[in-house]
């Protein structure tokens, strides 16, 4: 079955796996893992990674060139709307007018849970300034609807806390977000292994974004390959339509035509 492309804002993608660039041991490992993942969208923490703002330091864009990948600047490390907006403005300047960004405004350093109030405030400002916003948010369906109605081009509810590896803790609420949404819904944060990614896709999500699950694996390149396959398998399972759940057994062999009785 031929799948449709993933449409985010004005852009089209074949891969439904998005990856980050943090926590790798060096740029070579980053490069190899991203290649193994098959990802087309690579997210970069502007406040933590050099993409040209520090000319004397290694530039991440040397291994993820914008000609090959869609660079998705993110506002990781921002705890209020003003700093998130400033970070997006810097990203646009560094990337020659690039308007697609991932907005995340965090509530505290312990949980890195989204600060929904500041997220809404930043999203409104950035959308008014012409940005296309992919937004990290809680798994609250009402907040997700509000962000979509404001004009965000993708909703990114957390599966569980960033970097926790706890998987998809609230599949039911994420399913509700997906059912209500007219823009792509991508699970962001909490994926720990391939089965978590597959579950997110089986729920009907349009994609999965991850970083630590790959970078913190014992073999990041092999895990990146596993995640690619998991996202593809989960997507195919969703499109195929799973069998209904039943309380009792239902034999798979016919009940007539036995050779022996």
Curated annotation (Swiss-Prot):
Family label: Belongs to the ThiG family.
Organism: Acinetobacter baumannii (strain SDF)
Physiological role: Catalyzes the rearrangement of 1-deoxy-D-xylulose 5-phosphate (DXP) to produce the thiazole phosphate moiety of thiamine. Sulfur is provided by the thiocarboxylate moiety of the carrier protein ThiS. In vitro, sulfur can be provided by H(2)S.
Keyword set, alphabetical order: Cytoplasm, Schiff base, Thiamine biosynthesis, Transferase
Presence of keyword Transferase: yes
Catalytic activity: [ThiS sulfur-carrier protein]-C-terminal-Gly-aminoethanethioate + 2-iminoacetate + 1-deoxy-D-xylulose 5-phosphate = [ThiS sulfur-carrier protein]-C-terminal Gly-Gly + 2-[(2R,5Z)-2-carboxy-4-methylthiazol-5(2H)-ylidene]ethyl phosphate + 2 H2O + H(+)
Gene designation: thiG
Name this polypeptide is given: Thiazole synthase
HAMAP family, per database record: ThiG (MF_00443)
Subcellular location: Cytoplasm
């Amino acid at each position: 079955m031929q799948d449709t492309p993933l449409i985010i804002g004005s852009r089209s993608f074949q891969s439904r796996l998005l990856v980050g660039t943090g926590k790798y041991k060096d740029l070579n490992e980053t490069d190899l893992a991203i290649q193994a993942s098959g990802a087309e969208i690579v997210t970069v923490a502007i406040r933590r990674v050099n993409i040209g703002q520090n000319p004397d330091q290694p530039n991440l864009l040397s291994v993820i060139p914008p000609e090959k990948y869609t660079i998705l600047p993110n506002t990781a490390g921002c705890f209020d709307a003003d700093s998130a907006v400033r970070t997006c403005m810097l990203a646009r300047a560094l990337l020659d007018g690039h308007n697609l960004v991932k907005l995340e405004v965090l509530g505290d350093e312990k949980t890195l849970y989204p600060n929904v109030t500041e997220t809404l405030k930043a999203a409104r400002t950035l959308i008014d300034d012409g940005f296309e916003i992919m937004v990290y948010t809680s798994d609250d369906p009402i907040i997700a609807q509000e962000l979509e109605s404001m004009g965000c081009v993708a909703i990114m509810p957390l599966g569980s806390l960033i970097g926790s590896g706890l998987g998809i803790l609230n599949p039911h609420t994420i399913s509700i977000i997906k059912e209500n949404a007219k823009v792509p819904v991508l699970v962001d944060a909490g994926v720990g292994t391939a089965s978590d990614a597959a579950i997110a896709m089986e729920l009907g999500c349009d994609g999965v974004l991850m970083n630590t699950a790959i970078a913190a694996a014992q073999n990041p390149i092999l895990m990146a390959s596993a995640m690619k396959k998991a996202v593809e398998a989960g997507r195919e399972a969703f499109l195929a339509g799973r069998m209904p759940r039943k309380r009792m057994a239902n034999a798979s062999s016919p009940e007539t035509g036995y050779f022996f009785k």
